[in-house]
């Protein structure tokens, strides 16, 4: 039996609170159960040096965890003097995922930075960051259009992500920490609104998984992500 008696295919209670902070062009507090991430989108004129003069924009991301977002305190990475490998991997994943949602040529020479700060971690922080940052990005792009800085919205569609895994032989969707830490197989899936996949990260933590189990996990992920898309659309309509 899962925590809170969730069904195998069920996503945790999901909340997307827009305009959570007043300064950023887009800001969203995303909550998947007890996992809470603040996602902000900042728009700046100009692009990185390698893109100058090409007439296209750029989307990048930063990810971090507050020291007490976990059960015991983790020192800030700034205090250590460098970011860890996990942090770098996650923020690159977030940026890749959100770049897939935008026509960078139509964005023009703007850079949008997505900051994802984990306030409380209970599994699935990277997938929650992607799903929340997508809504913050949509708000930032809408403001660029409304201000007249862009003629048309360059967003191609929504992006969402979810974790799936095999725990004690059972395929489960949207793992919380107690499940993730016991998973034989752990997978993160990122998808576009039209059903195309952006990224699949799968690892056999214990037993290797079969082709049939892979297909089962992908189907679970697609169902969970459809639920997230519905929540994103509902939030953006408010």
Swiss-Prot record:
PROSITE patterns the record matches: RIBONUCLEASE_PH
Taxonomic superkingdom: Bacteria
SS bond list: none
InterPro entries assigned: ExoRNase_PH_dom1, ExoRNase_PH_dom2, ExoRNase_PH_dom2_sf, PNPase/RNase_PH_dom_sf, Ribosomal_Su5_D2-typ_SF, RNase_PH, RNase_PH_bac-type, RNase_PH_CS
E.C. numbers: 2.7.7.56
Pfam family, one: RNase_PH
Gene Ontology biological process terms, A to Z: rRNA catabolic process; rRNA processing; tRNA processing
Coiled coil: none
Keyword RNA-binding appears in the UniProt entry: yes
Residues annotated as binding phosphate: 86, 124-126
SUPFAM superfamilies per UniProt: Ribonuclease PH domain 2-like, Ribosomal protein S5 domain 2-like
Keywords, sorted A to Z: Nucleotidyltransferase, RNA-binding, rRNA processing, Transferase, tRNA processing, tRNA-binding
Catalytic activity: tRNA(n+1) + phosphate = tRNA(n) + a ribonucleoside 5'-diphosphate
EC main group: transferase
GO terms assigned for molecular function: 3'-5'-RNA exonuclease activity; tRNA binding; tRNA nucleotidyltransferase activity
Protein family: Belongs to the RNase PH family.
Subunit structure: Homohexameric ring arranged as a trimer of dimers.
Biological role stated in the UniProt entry: Phosphorolytic 3'-5' exoribonuclease that plays an important role in tRNA 3'-end maturation. Removes nucleotide residues following the 3'-CCA terminus of tRNAs; can also add nucleotides to the ends of RNA molecules by using nucleoside diphosphates as substrates, but this may not be physiologically important. Probably plays a role in initiation of 16S rRNA degradation (leading to ribosome degradation) during starvation.
Stated name of the protein: Ribonuclease PH
Organism: Yersinia enterocolitica serotype O:8 / biotype 1B (strain NCTC 13174 / 8081)
């Amino acid at each position: 039996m899962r925590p809170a008696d969730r069904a195998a295919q069920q996503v945790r209670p999901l909340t997307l609170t827009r305009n959570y902070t007043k300064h950023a062009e887009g800001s969203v507090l995303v909550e998947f159960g007890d996992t809470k991430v603040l996602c902000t989108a900042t728009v700046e004129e100009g692009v990185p040096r390698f893109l100058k003069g090409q007439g296209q924009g750029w989307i990048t991301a930063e990810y971090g965890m507050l020291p007490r977002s976990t059960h015991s305190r983790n020192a800030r990475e700034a205090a250590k003097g460098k970011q860890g490998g996990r942090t770098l991997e996650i923020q690159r994943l977030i940026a890749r995922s959100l770049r897939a949602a935008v026509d960078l040529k139509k964005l023009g020479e703007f850079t949008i930075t997505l900051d994802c700060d984990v306030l409380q971690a209970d599994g699935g922080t990277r997938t929650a960051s992607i799903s929340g940052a997508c809504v913050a990005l949509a708000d930032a792009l809408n403001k660029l259009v409304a201000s007249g800085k862009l003629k048309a919205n360059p967003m191609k569609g929504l992006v969402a992500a979810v974790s799936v895994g095999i725990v004690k032989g059972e395929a489960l969707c949207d793992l919380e920490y107690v499940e993730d830490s016991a998973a034989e197989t752990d997978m993160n899936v990122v998808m576009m609104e039209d059903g195309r996949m952006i990224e699949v990260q799968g690892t056999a933590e214990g037993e290797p998984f079969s082709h049939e189990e892979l297909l089962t996990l992908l189907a679970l992920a697609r169902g969970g992500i459809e639920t997230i898309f519905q929540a994103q659309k509902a939030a953006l309509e408010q």
